[in-house]
Amino acid sequence: MKRLFLALSTLLCITSVSAGNSEYVNPFIGTSNFGATHPGAQYPNGLASVSPFNVAFGGDTNPTKKDDSWNSRGYIYENGYLTGFSHLNLSGVGCPEAGVLLLMPTAGKLMLEAEKYGSTYSNEQAKPGYYQAFLDKYKIKAEVTSTLRTGLSRFTF
């Protein structure tokens, strides 16, 4: 009887802890009003931090672009035009670290200018360690995550 009680108690404890506090985290907090954070995928103390980059082109969908006055961030919540995903970011400092080498899934003819190859996006979702968005122009679902030593991207065409 004691073993059964111990087994049931252990099972109850494991199931009650499994959800954790991460379900209450909103990665979009701090991505407006010069908060300088990004909603991208980060692993605690990891080497890679994969984040959307939506400040390269102003236009109508991006009211704020990179290097406008004080702005040096790689992501701004109010912007709606994505030009890729950066894998080297420090959230909270207001800049992509070590330069910006963007990974951008596209289809069709190769275009090199950000205002041409970029895309508006929808269905943006973020939770700790995961980010996704749907690239409207190319009809591509982009998902990114990170591990201790690398960032992983999955693009569904």
Short names for language-model regions:
Residues 20-157:
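Accessory carbohydrate-recognition regions in carbohydrate-active enzymes
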Residues 4-15:
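Sec-dependent N-terminal signal peptides
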